[in-house]
């Protein structure tokens, strides 16, 4: 049985180099379907989801080659097969973002309904409505979405919610549309700004990415380019939270503090010390943390991906904290696993009430998704006795070297097959 074993550990000390952002790399890889030629992508994390996206691109007709560590060479020969099969899409929800670029480039796309992490429904209606406003038409049957269009036409699109995936899909489609597209109430995440930077390198005209209004002037043709993916703020948050739980002092090399302002502010309220420099972030925790209340919100608010780490921190903090999930339903499932470890947590609808305890207790637990699995790993740093995290393959979807990095910082952690 594949499992991660964590035994009682002391404070963490040392350096961790932050990898490229999963949520940026996957979308940039999908955008390679927009133009012929050979793309060179750097700072790409070596994780399961990237390998799955590589398989998907190959199934479309591209070639993907690993050049050096964290570097991909993607060649698009043109005349791609505009179908993303169920066998690949079911494993990764992010696969849906090939829909927009395939429609824009080839006038058709057939994409299986997506799978991925299991934490409640995340409808793709906003993706489809936005693309329809650009001129696409869709039919859904037998578990597939079939789309077709003539050349897409620019339009003003107001999103009912700042959906990251919908913003990305519409943005990638609009770069080859005829005319101007304006996306209002757009998602503002750093990964969207990174995707826009990549598209602009290709010859697109995207203005305002990272703000709530994005303006795209369609162009006739794009070209292949080089690009380095931005650092992963979610990975950085994982190690930051690990220090909050176990204590210690580490440097997060390459982390972008400007992408993590709200998180840094919140953990500062809890008692952590954080400072930024040109190399990244320095984080320290040398005393018990104080409980706070927090709520997930679209960027620049507290990301829903941060929440499992913050819940794990609150589980061993002094006092009572209330966490409210405003973005996704069903994303408290990992709390049952923390309760198995001795956490005092009560859930009420979209709220979790967490009463901190001094230490957790080692127990066998299961990783339900990427971030929940990582949260269980770092929570185990503060557990008495051995903790066994089962189904760590979920963690592999988003982390390149979580076990190795924590071990290098002083954690007593290993992986067994």
Each language-model region and where it sits:
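Short, structured segments at the rim of ligand-binding sites
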Residues: 1-417
